[in-house]
Amino acid sequence: IVEMSVAGGNYGYALMWVIVVAVAMRYVFVSLIAKYQLCNPHGEGVLDGLSRLHWLYAPFLMVSAIVMGHVYESYVTVGIGEAFVNLFGRGTVWGWAALWNGVALAIVFRPVYGHVERVFKGLLVLLTLSFLGTALWVGPSPSGIFRGTLAFALPDQVGQFSPLLITIGMLGAIGGSLLNLVYPYFLEDKGWTQPKHRRVQTYDFLLAMVVMIVLDLSVWTLGAELLHAQGLQIATMDDLPRLLSEVLGRAGRTLFYVGIFAVLFTSVVGFAMGLARMASHGLLRWRAGS
């Protein structure tokens, strides 16, 4: 959401081609990972297959999962704190962050987490529908989207964030990152472990891709039409709620922060569980001699 907001708000539709490349990268990477996980003749996971190619993959991915797990959790933690400070206007970033990390730790291994997760998913659906409805109300520019999709060029820098930085951020966040290698563990959680599950996995992944694309394009449109068209820019986190508050008023600002909190809180749990499993898998494979 942040990447799309800044891209649309600061550069209009000029970087639209980046999201096309990023989505294509994500589809290729995740599809290859899922196909190997479900259909390889050895009945092994992706990390196991990489470890058979070279023994260093196991310790490398173990260390990478630990390091990047701390990096991911750090910025998500800060995001939670900033969301609550901006929403309520009181407290400190680290105070709120510590509180909600404590809540996550307390409930993640208890049956109650499933119910909490469903509530947050409901909030995410509400946020997505709000972005989509507001974007349709504002109205995207088909010609601007078309030109931006075919541009394949970086515009001059506007504001604090260079177009190259935004491009790298989108390619990493959407296209390819270490988190793609966590996907097989969530397939196992769903019980999808055999070639016969390939079809349902593909449908599930395509649905997730469609939802992601709709959300990204909605946020991008709001940034381009509400902010960029008026010469406004996104410089701080408190500029982001204007994507909804320009149309929905104060309720839009509140909805934005509540939705962002839902995204970040579920990410705290998801990153911790997924990357921890990758790290432990890498350790076990390394100790077994790959």
Residues covered by each model-derived region:
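Hydrophobic alpha-helical segments and their helix-loop junctions in multi-pass secondary transporters
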Residues: V125-Q157, L164-Y185
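Select transmembrane alpha-helical segments in multipass membrane proteins
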Residues: H54-V67, L99-W100, V158-L171, I213-V214, ...
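Transmembrane alpha-helical segments of multi-pass small-molecule transport proteins
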Residues: M62-V63, L87-F109, V125-L136, R287-S290
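Extracellular/periplasmic helix-exit of transmembrane alpha-helices
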Residues: Y27-C39, L187, V210-D239
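Hydrophobic transmembrane alpha-helices that form the core helical bundles
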Residues: C39, Y57-G89, L264-L283
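Transmembrane helix-boundary motif of multi-pass solute transporters/channels
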Residues: I1-M25, L32, A235-L240
